[in-house]
Amino acid sequence: MTIPFWQEKTLEQMTENEWESLCDGCGKCCLHKLMDEDSDEVYYTNVACSWLNDKTCSCKDYPNRFTSGEECLKLTRDKIDEFHWLPDTCAYRLLSESKPIPEWHPLITGSKSEMHAAGESVRNKVVYEIDVVDWEDHILNHPNR
């Protein structure tokens, strides 16, 4: 039996296609985050980037996402040490922490359907910036709520 590439290679050793395939397409990294100025704690909101399609959990303009004016961050191998802000289910983060990827990950199941069924995507769970008045009302992981 062949060992999956993500189990035998480090993130630095992966090809560009392998690297890109680690993204499960959950859309969580497309949610706006707020940072506590005192503690540097990162809080996820349910406020999505205006380019996120909330049905497919994909960018509406993926090829131009870094030049669209949005705050889309490119995940690169030289920034692995900064991956702590990614969702705790993210393959990039998990592999950078020497942890296994989830059983519902599309690399294991062959499709995104298991991820959506497990409730691990943002499908139909977001609001858009234009509809938000008080961003703090949209914090998902606030410790005091």
Curated annotation (Swiss-Prot):
Pfam families: CxxCxxCC
HAMAP family found in the cross-reference section: UPF0260
Family: Belongs to the UPF0260 family.
Protein name: UPF0260 protein VS_0923
Record organism: Vibrio atlanticus (strain LGP32) (Vibrio splendidus (strain Mel32))
